[in-house]
Amino acid sequence: MKKSENLDLITIGRSSVDLYGSQIGGRLEDMRTFQKYIGGSPTNIAAGAARLGLKSAIITRVGNEHMGRFIVEQLKKEGVNTDGFKIDQERLTALVILGIRNKNDFPLIFYRENCADMALSTNDIDKKFISCLLYTS
């Protein structure tokens, strides 16, 4: 991995695909259609920072499958540096299914057992790449 060049922010941690139920106000049990988004606090922060004009990057793991490629491609479109991504050949990308009932209630189900980002380790971090780090949980 190359040294980070003038990055304002590097996040590290969870990357997932969030599937939001399109029928706002309904129960998850009743959802028929979903919209697909990138998810995970570090992923969302990196994308949001890029939208605000900052040079951001993320260190994470995703699976070598459709959902993992979706996250990488979406972040590249947002202008996020993805040099810190590790592609996991054995694990799938995390998935979250969510609904929006009202402003205070949003049911969700995490599919994260043995997923790629849960296998992220210190060995995945190139010290030359890090210039700053924001920890979120």
Question: How would you label these PLM feature ranges?
Answer:
Residues 135-136:
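Conserved small/polar residues in nucleotide/adenosyl-binding loops
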Residues 2-80, 108, 120-123:
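Glycine-rich phosphate/adenosyl-contacting loop at the front of the ribokinase-like
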Residues 13, 60, 84, 99, ...:
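Pocket-edge structural micro-motifs
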Residues 2-4, 26, 89-90, 100-103, ...:
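Solvent-exposed alpha-helices and their adjacent loops that cap or buttress functional pockets
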Residues 115-119:
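A generic, well-ordered mixed alpha/beta core segment in the N-terminal half of proteins
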Residues 88-90, 94-114:
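Glycine-rich nucleotide/cofactor/substrate-binding loop typically near the N-terminus or early
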Residues 122-132:
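Short amphipathic alpha-helix with an adjacent loop that forms part of the alpha/beta core around
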Residues 61-63, 83-91:
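Beta-strand->loop->alpha-helix junctions that form or flank phosphate-binding loops
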